[in-house]
Each structure stands twice: as structure tokens, then as C-alpha cells.
Amino acid sequence: MQKVMNDPEDLGNCKICLQRADGIHFAVSSCRACAAFFRRTVILKLNYTCKEKGNCTVEKSLRNLCRSCRYTRCINEGMKIELVQLQRDSIGRKKSGASISIDPLFTPNVASSLSAIFKNEKEDVLSTSCTILSQMTSGYAMFLNIRRSTNTLVQSSVITPTFKMPKIELHASRFDSAKQVCKAEAHLVTDIVNSYFSPFNSLKFEDKVALFKNFFCYFSHTDRAYQSFKQFESDNLNDKILMPDGGFIKRTELGRFYENAEGVHTSAEDAAKIFQPALNYILDVIVDYMRRIHIIETEYLALLGFCLWDDAVPGLSKEAKSLAVQTQSKLLAELQNFYSSQNKDAVEITQRVGVLLLLVPKLTKCVIMLRENSVLAELFNYYEADVCCKNFKEDASVDLDCTSQCIVHTKND
């Protein structure tokens, strides 16, 4: 008599990896991890190559070693590609209590998929009458949502359709996971800037590359400082800085960040010595200054706008320089209007703008320090920088050896 598969206890083992199955996924009794792997492979159209002869063992403890054989097993056991398509198209119509399993082996392409979903949700909200700052606010909110999602993808295998993450206790960050998320973050930021940091999208490709390469270094380190300030605002003795992977680095334990990391070729202590001064500077100068002036998000985004629209960036066309100057003026005007709406008088507005802009040279010094530290670390082969991070060096040419399509990795056809 054929077994009825309605009771989870009657599902038996996963047909793919042989661990306990928890449901019928894509017409096959399987576990969430294998279902998520199959879904991700199909949606992102990933191709795998077996390094052996196509007969690798696929079981719970070894299922991640050969993705080619794992995917082949999925197909051979009867998983249906067309069912993945149907489920993907109905993401927005699922009940908020449901969950989608995502394979934790995260790639930047997943970030692009998440970005597309969020963008579709936001497009109806934005209108052509939005100011530069309000568009940036919407884009930054979407960026934070996606980044929380990418952190969860790296740390676990479950994500809700609405991408509202449960509160997770802070954990000590590690080099490998931070590098993984940072690589994805670079692609996310290109998409956010291109879509929401008006009028960036109107620039020629070469001008986009020049401005973005300069901007991303500012954004990456400034956002760590800003998020650290927000997280530990009331703690004047805070000695931790938040990292892109959702974890933190403690000032006195920087060496732990580099322990047992695949891309680090020296001792954790030696790697820490290279970057300790920059970490101290971020905490003692930038985060401390943000705390003293009680910076708010609108001011922070205006600051990012000034860093992006730098007309002194080498290689800009005349048109781009002119647009940068115009956008700077518009940002200043919008910032003044914002302060006026907060009932500040002319003197208070002038003082506040001055206090805010005094942060820019501090950010510039931090960027210079970190660039010099990175060059030194690579010179002595202390660690391996991924291809995306290498592209953001001041004197680096654009390296197109990247699987994702973003501003700094796409040729101008």
C-alpha cells in the first residue's frame, strides 16, 4: 500500500542527502537545506562542475562538497524545475508567517535577487517629485533591509518572505564571513546608488566608475562607524565596531577577527597590528564625533551625498564635474530646508551645517589610513583581498573578473 506523505513523521529520509526529510519540496521528499539548494541553483541559473568523475557521495555531512553531484541527485530523484518557477513568482503573495529556506552558501548574485524584490516593493512608493535626500532615504532603508537578509543568509538557512529578521544577538565577527558579506555589499551599494542616489544614473559609464570607486571606500567605513554609533550611542566607553556581517570587532581583541581565516597568511596578531591604528581612529575620532554632535540619519545621508558627488575625483568629464557641483548645491539647499522644518533659525542652520561638514576631513583621513594598511598587508602577503575590494583602490584599474553585473564590473557596451 502506498505511503501517504501528509504526516511529517511518515516522510522518511531526504532523497538527496539522506537526513530526515521535513516535507515534499518540488515533488520530492527532502530536507529544507536540499530544497533551498535546488531552488537557488534554478533561480540563479548556476552551473557546477564535478572535480571527480560525477559520482561523489552526497549525504548530510558531505552534501556541500560537490554541488554538481548534489544538483544531479536532485534531478535524478525527480525534483521539478518548473515548480521552482511557480513558487518564485508567488513570493509576494505568501502569508507573512511562512518561511523560505535559503542555502547558506551565499553568493553576490543572491544579493542582486534580493535587491530586485525590494526594488519592486518600493517603486510604487517613490514619485518623480521626491527630493534627492528623500530618495536616498528610501534607498538606504532598502539597503539596510537587504544587508540584514544577507547576514542571515550567511549565518543561517532561513529567511522570511518579507525579509523581516528576528532580533539576533551580536556575535564576534570573523574575517571570512565579513569578507563574504563585504563582497556582496559592494554589489548591493552599486545598485542602490544607481537607482536611488539621483542623478547618478544619468552619468556616463566612465564617470559612474570614477565616482563610485571613490565613494565606496567612504561609504564602507563611514557606515560601519554610523551603525556602531547607533548601536552603542549611550555607551561612552564602547570599544566595539560593527561589521558588515552583523558581528562586531572589539578593540582589544582585533586578533580574534583574523584567527583561523582562510584568506589570512600570517598570524592573527600580525594582521591585527596592521589595522589596529585604523580601528582606533574609527572609534576614537569618527564614532566619538558622531556621538558628540548626535548625528541623525538625514544628516548622515547628506554626508554620503557630499562624498559621492566629489567634483575633484580624477578622470571626470566636464559634464560630470558640472553635475557634481550642481548636486552638491541641491543637497545643501535640501539640508537647509530640512533644518528649517525642524524650526532651526538661520544661525543654528549655519552652525549645524558647519559642524556636519567638519566630519568630512576625518572620513578622508580614515579612508587614506585603511587604503595604506590594505596595500601594506597585500605587499607582505598578509591576506587575500577579493576581486571586488581590489577594484576600489584609488589607483586600481577595473577588474572585470566578477560573476555579478554591477557598475564597476560591467563593460560599457
UniProtKB/Swiss-Prot annotation:
Changing residue 63 to C: Does not bind DNA enhancer elements. Residues 135-396 form the NR LBD domain. One of its GO terms (cellular component) is nucleus. Belongs to the nuclear hormone receptor family. The record marks 23, 30, 63 as: Required for DNA binding. It is found in: Nucleus; Cytoplasm. Residues 11-86 bind DNA. Keywords: Cytoplasm, DNA-binding, Metal-binding, Nucleus, Receptor, Transcription, Transcription regulation, Zinc, Zinc-finger. CDD domains: NR_DBD_HNF4A (cd06960). GO terms for molecular function: cis-regulatory region sequence-specific DNA binding; DNA-binding transcription factor activity; RNA polymerase II cis-regulatory region sequence-specific DNA binding; zinc ion binding. Nuclear receptor transcription factor that binds to DNA enhancer elements to promote the transcription of genes required to maintain micronutrient homeostasis. Direct binding to its ligand zinc allows for nuclear accumulation and activation, which thereby induces the transcription of genes required to promote the storage and detoxification of excess dietary zinc. This in turn, allows for internal zinc levels to be detected and regulated. The keyword Metal-binding applies. Residues 101-412 are annotated as: Required for zinc-binding. The keyword Transcription applies. It comes from the Eukaryota. PANTHER family: HIGH ZINC ACTIVATED NUCLEAR RECEPTOR PROTEIN, NUCLEAR HORMONE RECEPTOR FAMILY MEMBER NHR-86-RELATED. This is High zinc activated nuclear receptor protein. Its main location: nucleus. Induction: Induced by high levels of zinc. Disruption phenotype: In the presence of excess dietary zinc, reduced transcription of genes such as cdf-2, ttm-1b and mtl-1, which are required for zinc homeostasis, and retarded growth as compared to wild-type.
